Amino acid sequence: MGKTIGLTGSVATGKSTVSNMIQQAGIPLVDADIAARKVVERGTEGLKEIVAYFGEEILLADGTLNRAKLGEIIFKDKEKREKLNEITHPRVKDYMLEARERFFEAGEELVFFDIPLLFESHLESLVDKIVVVWTTPETELKRLMERNNLTKEDALRRIESQMGIDEKARKADFVIDNNESLEKTQKQVLTFIKRFVKNK
């Protein structure tokens, strides 16, 4: 059986950049955000269950999920947010495990699970090791303000809604320092991969 590595970070620490580097190195990666979209596509049991609970008004004219509308509803209502998680989380988990199984059956030695809220969702048991993409909190704040065109207050609010990056780094098995150049980050990524995969 191959190894599964959980990849996580915080809101603007560069996890997507590292995720792309991993895939460019030829290592399979299963993205929790993509899985979350797949399990509520038109015609899925996930979407049917969401409609049964929230009503037809959360659908667009073409029968797909109106994410903006659903987002508005769950943002204001904790009970509804928990219900949505109850519907989607087990399906996302199954989707990711099935994808991993296919990679291992195809002979892959290493699979990454890209899970933004890995610690917050208590999904540590899904993976063998955890890698956190880290930057200083100052760099994280600066990048988020620039990337999303946010005020300092809005950016801080978004960062504070998640577990702090330093706490995530303490919980991790490995930390990739993405505070400097992309070249340095890539070197760390490739060194990490070589620990587990001999021919990469």
Curated annotation (Swiss-Prot):
It catalyses: 3'-dephospho-CoA + ATP = ADP + CoA + H(+). It is found in: Cytoplasm. Catalyzes the phosphorylation of the 3'-hydroxyl group of dephosphocoenzyme A to form coenzyme A. Belongs to the CoaE family. It holds the Pfam family CoaE. GO terms for cellular component: cytoplasm. Its EC number is 2.7.1.24. It comes from Listeria monocytogenes serotype 4b (strain F2365). This is Dephospho-CoA kinase. GO terms for molecular function: ATP binding; dephospho-CoA kinase activity. The lineage of its organism: Bacteria, Bacillati, Bacillota, Bacilli, Bacillales. Gene3D superfamilies: P-loop containing nucleotide triphosphate hydrolases. Pathway: Cofactor biosynthesis; coenzyme A biosynthesis; CoA from (R)-pantothenate: step 5/5.
